[in-house]
From Swiss-Prot:
It holds the Pfam family Vps16_N. Residues 642-736 are annotated as: Interaction with VPS33A. This is Vacuolar protein sorting-associated protein 16 homolog. Belongs to the VPS16 family. Keywords: Cytoplasmic vesicle, Endosome, Lysosome, Membrane, Nitration, Protein transport, Transport. It comes from the Eukaryota. The gene is VPS16. The keyword rRNA processing does not apply. Its main location: membrane. GO terms for cellular component: autophagosome; clathrin-coated vesicle; early endosome; endosome; HOPS complex; late endosome membrane; lysosomal membrane. It is a peripheral membrane protein. GO terms for biological process: endosomal transport; intracellular protein transport; vacuole fusion, non-autophagic. Core component of at least two putative endosomal tethering complexes, the homotypic fusion and vacuole protein sorting (HOPS) complex and the class C core vacuole/endosome tethering (CORVET) complex. Their common core is composed of the class C Vps proteins VPS11, VPS16, VPS18 and VPS33A, which in HOPS further associates with VPS39 and VPS41 and in CORVET with VPS8 and TGFBRAP1. Interacts with RAB5C. Interacts with STX17, MON1B. Associates with adapter protein complex 3 (AP-3) and clathrin:AP-3 complexes.
């Protein structure tokens, strides 16, 4: 244990810092780091190097090379730089490389050197060029801030949603500031810059002079400044060799340190741990690394090579041509277990487990000591927590064995934390492997989340490892394996050296019907790569037509899209394709396409009936569909024509169409309608009143109501209205007029073809019982009982029913008898029924 703490360095009385090697770099750099533009992504991210030929003379023919490596030095990409001079490099939160050029254009590259997009930082930059730039991260995304040759600042807080903000001018700024950085306060990005002994804070509205509280006197300029990983703290390096540390709001001073070095440092970054009260800053010169904080002494390291610092959530990565190291504050759990002469519960439990392996009785002594103090649960938890913060698997195993050993003597210790730590460490050890090169710490891993880690493995095309992690952690398929397989398939379609058939087959064999995988998304990626035929083959595996059709339309495969939409049975989808086809094809080709798709043609006709009547007529004409064409002209005659002549002409066209369709009934009916219209116009001219657009029956009724009985009868003869129907019409009309005398004459004009019960019913409907009784006596025997009941003559109805010996009629009469007035009648019927039953 003493040996294990050999690389621990105390900073004051309450904190230790250690630096250990992550990787031995084997990237075979041809240039020194000082001769390159360098950018390293946080959270164990990749490293980008661009030899800067614009600051050092090189042969005119030589082009700079942009190289991207993993954190372990494994090459990921290398490409010749063919664009303009680059001022700064930086990584976005999505691990995209942002290259800021002098002309203000920012080029965005993927992890494997694939060009993604570009954007400009404004027109002003074209004239004044970019002097310096910073890439920073906020809760909204990754931002870019630039300093132009006019000594003005422009920034965008989110390159994914580019909104440029030109910051206010700094008064009296005639040259570039000695140092500057971005500060995020209250969810807004600011610029903090130093001009001589003065500090200025720029926001979108104003430029404010600020003064660090408690700053040592004699400062004439600030040489370097650094903001902490979480933007909560700020460090300033002055020309007097002092380092001021305080809050980023510049309202509170934390501490100050005199490093007795006035030379400006190459880099200065914060080194802090989440939930730690200690605050420290790491300062790097050419061959010296210094850790300073709220302590009278500093920690110093000698740098054998040119090195680069990468601030992290819980420490600082330091890499050079040969090594990649991690410098951080020793976590509390590790400190309590491993520091010399520690009597912490975790330290005693670790010793107990080691003695147990040696089969020594000291194991029992250590264990009893912990149990007597009631600290065994705390000891187990300390060992579990410390294991998470250890980089080397052997030490992780030792601590976890100790925790497992202690758990055996506890009845109710929840196993979740132990199991979860074992899983997390197995994942961390897998991704820390040299060939993977993602040296995440436990704190970084928890902050990043497993989903983001999987996304980063996918970005590196490490699909098998990502799938193994998903299966090991038993993540839901849609969030884990399915999502990764979908990414793999999207990458697979970009492999242009493999045939479309082979790629489609390989993707289908791997994915099958995996839930959560959208073949249409993969097909869209294939189409974006210029592989239309592959996209079509992939869409064959997509079970949802609603996902197939939009992409087929985008690929200008409209006829195939129509077939798929029809197969789906989704009428809305079919309409979508039809409207697209209508705009895409000429009229003839469009109609020809419809003729080959009966369902689509039927739906389009329905659409045209409501929206495009002329198109509907063209469809019927093209198909020689005279029956529907006739129906169309009939509807059109009433919908569009107001003049009687135009309406008759349209009906004549309809009749001709019906004759061509060999539908003589429809043709004759149409001709009858034309005759009726002409007659109605003549009646209006001669009699006045409203006749047009009345039906034949209503026309007859109107004539009767107007007293034009002869005209009504003539109309009935002309249009061959049956006698029964004419009698009904006349009966109803005369009753409505309450012309009872004329009604009686009409009833006696000849024998009624409808009988006389309707006369009784109509009179009773008009509440005229007197007239109804006149016709009740004329009703035939089979309807006599019903007629008598209608006029309320229950006794006579009973006599007729008894005379007829009709059981149904007697029951009907009984149902109309009331106890008070018709008791005798009811008894009479009952006696008749009884006599009938005896016989």
């Amino acid at each position: 244990m003493d040996c294990y703490t050999a690389n621990w360095n105390p900073l004051g009385d309450s904190a230790f810092y250690r630096k250990y090697e992550l990787y031995s770099m084997d990237w075979d750099l041809k240039e020194e780091l000082r001769d390159c533009l360098v950018a390293a992504a946080p959270y164990g991210g990749p490293i980008a190097l661009l030899r800067n030929p614009w600051r050092k003379e090189k042969p005119a023919s030589a082009r700079p090379v942009l190289e991207i490596y993993s954190a372990s030095g494994v090459p990921l990409a290398s490409l010749l730089w063919k664009s303009g001079p680059v001022v700064s490099l930086g990584w976005s939160a999505e691990e995209e490389l942002l290259c800021v050029q002098e002309d203000g254009v920012v080029l965005v590259y993927g992890l494997h050197g694939d060009f993604r997009r570009h954007f400009s930082m404004g027109n002003e930059v074209l004239q004044n060029r970019v002097l310096d730039a910073r890439i920073f991260h906020t809760e909204f995304g990754s931002g870019v801030a630039i300093l132009t040759g006019a000594h003005r600042f422009t920034l965008s807080a989110n390159v994914g949603d580019l909104k440029l903000r030109r910051m206010p001018e700094v008064p009296g700024l005639x040259s570039a500031p000695s140092c500057w950085t971005t500060v995020c306060q209250d969810r807004v990005a600011h610029i903090l810059l130093a001009v001589g002994p003065d500090l200025y804070l720029l926001d979108h509205a104003a430029c404010s002079a600020v003064t660090p509280p408690g700053l040592a006197p004699g400062v004439s300029s600030f040489l370097q400044m650094a903001v902490s990983f979480t933007y909560r703290h700020l460090a300033l390096f002055t020309d007097t060799g002092y380092i001021w540390m305080g809050t980023a709001s510049l309202k509170e001073k934390l501490c100050e340190f005199n490093c007795n070095i006035r030379a400006p440092p190459k880099q200065m970054v914060w080194c802090s741990r989440p939930r730690s009260k200690e605050r420290a800053v790491v300062v790097a010169w050419e061959r010296r690394l210094m850790v300073v904080g709220d302590a009278p002494e500093s920690i110093q390291f000698v740098l054998d090579e040119d090195s680069y610092l990468v601030p992290e959530l819980d420490g600082v990565r330091v890499f050079s041509r040969s090594t990649h190291e991690f410098l951080h504050e020793v976590p509390v759990a590790s400190e309590e277990i491993f520091k010399i002469a520690s009597m912490a519960p975790g330290a005693l439990l670790l010793e107990a487990q080691k003695e147990y392996e040696k089969e020594s009785q000291k194991a029992d002594e250590y264990l009893r000591e912990i149990q007597e103090l009631g600290q065994l649960p705390q000891a187990v938890q300390q060992c579990i927590e410390a294991a998470g913060h250890e980089h080397w698997p052997d030490m992780q195993k030792s601590l976890l064995r100790a925790a497992s050993f202690g758990k055996c003597f506890l009845d109710r210790f929840p196993p979740d934390s132990f199991v979860r730590m074992c899983q997390d460490l197995r994942v961390l050890n897998a991704i820390r492997d040299y060939h993977i090169g993602i040296p995440l710490t436990y704190s970084q891993y928890k902050q990043l989340t497993i989903q983001v880690l999987l996304d980063r493995l996918v970005l590196r095309r490490l699909y098998p490892l990502a799938i193994q992690i998903c299966e090991y952690l038993r993540l839901p398929e849609v969030q884990g394996v399915s999502r990764i397989l979908a990414h793999w398939a999207c990458y697979k379609v970009q492999q242009k050296d493999v045939s479309d058939e082979d790629v489609a087959r390989a993707i289908n064999q791997k994915l099958g019907d995996t839930p959560g995988v959208s073949y249409s998304d993969i097909a869209a990626r294939a189409y974006g790569c210029g592989r239309t035929e592959l996209a079509i083959k992939l869409l064959e595996y997509e079970p949802r037509s609603g996902e197939q059709v939009p992409l087929l339309l985008k690929m200008k495969r409209s006829k195939l899209a129509l077939s798929k939409a029809i197969e789906s049975g989704d009428t809305d989808l079919v309409f979508t394709v039809l409207l697209h086809l209508k705009n895409e094809l000429n009229r003839g080709d469009f109609f020809m396409t419809l003729r080959n798709q009966p369902m689509a043609l039927s739906l389009y006709r329905q659409f045209c009936k409501h929206q495009e009547l002329e198109t509907l007529k063209d469809l019927y004409n093209q198909d020689d569909n005279h029956q529907e064409l006739g129906s169309f002209h009939i509807r059109a005659s009433y919908a569009a024509e107001e003049r009687i002549e135009g309406r008759v002409a349209a009906l004549q066209t309809a009749a001709d169409a019906f004759y061509k369709a060999k539908n003589e009934f429809a043709a004759k009916a149409t001709e009858d309608q034309m005759r009726l219209l002409r007659l109605q116009r003549r009646l209006e001219d001669e009699l006045g009143g409203q006749f047009l657009d009345l039906s034949l029956h209503d026309t007859v009724t109107t004539l009767i109501l107007s007293g034009q009985n002869k005209r009504a009868e003539q109309l009935a003869r002309d249009f061959r209205i049956p006698d029964k129907r004419l009698w009904w019409l006349k009966l109803t009309a005369l009753a409505d007029l309450e012309d009872w005398e004329e009604l009686e004459k009409f009833s006696k004009s000849k024998k009624s073809p409808i009988g006389y019960l309707p006369f009784v019913e109509i009179c009773m409907k008009q509440h005229n019982k007197y007239e109804a009784k006149k016709y009740a006596s004329r009703v035939g025997p089979e309807q006599k009982v019903k007629a008598l009941l209608l006029v309320g003559d229950v006794a006579q109805a009973a006599d007729v029913a008894i005379e007829h010996r009709n059981e149904a009629e007697m029951s009907l009469v009984l149902s109309h008898c009331t106890g008070a007035t018709d008791g005798a009648t009811a008894d009479k019927i009952q006696r008749a029924r009884a006599q009938a039953q005896k016989k």
